[in-house]
Amino acid sequence: MSLPIKFRAIFLIFGIVAIALTSGALAYQASLIPASRLINPDELVKILQSPRSEKPLMIQVGSHVLYTQAHIPGSEYIGPASSETGLQSLRKRVESLPRNKFIVLYCGCCPWSHCPNVKPADDALHAMGFTNVKILYIADNFGADWVEKGYPVGKGD
């Protein structure tokens, strides 16, 4: 499944903006997240398709525009975790959950090493005591690493 050219352009623009905004902001780079906390797209799809697997709460922590264009079905949008508003939304969404709840965070706005959203979201959940958090490893962007690989896609809010 090939992504329409306008979506590719939007992913590229958001990637460039994210890189520009986060250059030098090493504390928020996804590359600082330990490999043990990552999950690959194929692993997540197997979990979602298995009738016996515990289904995670999936939270998109990036741009609303990207979420409405394409997201993982069943995932929830809470806002960019690079902003305090997004982090507050994340905390509010999970505050009543058991601390061992299986949660998957993802963004996909730009190349992994420059993502401004997944590291703050991961840090916030771990600071709250969550112990079963995984970050979806998206090497380039959501379009290339999820949509174009034919994984399930939802659209709209």
Locations of the language-model features?
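Short active-site oxyanion
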Residues: R52-M58, N132
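Rhodanese-like catalytic fold shared by cysteine-dependent sulfurtransferases
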Residues: S2-L38, T68-D157
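A short, well-structured juxtamembrane/interface segment
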Residues: A35-S50
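Short hydrophobic beta-strand that contains or immediately precedes a catalytic carboxylate
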Residues: L57-G62, S75-I78
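Flexible, charged surface loops at secondary-structure boundaries
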Residues: Q49-S53, S96-R99
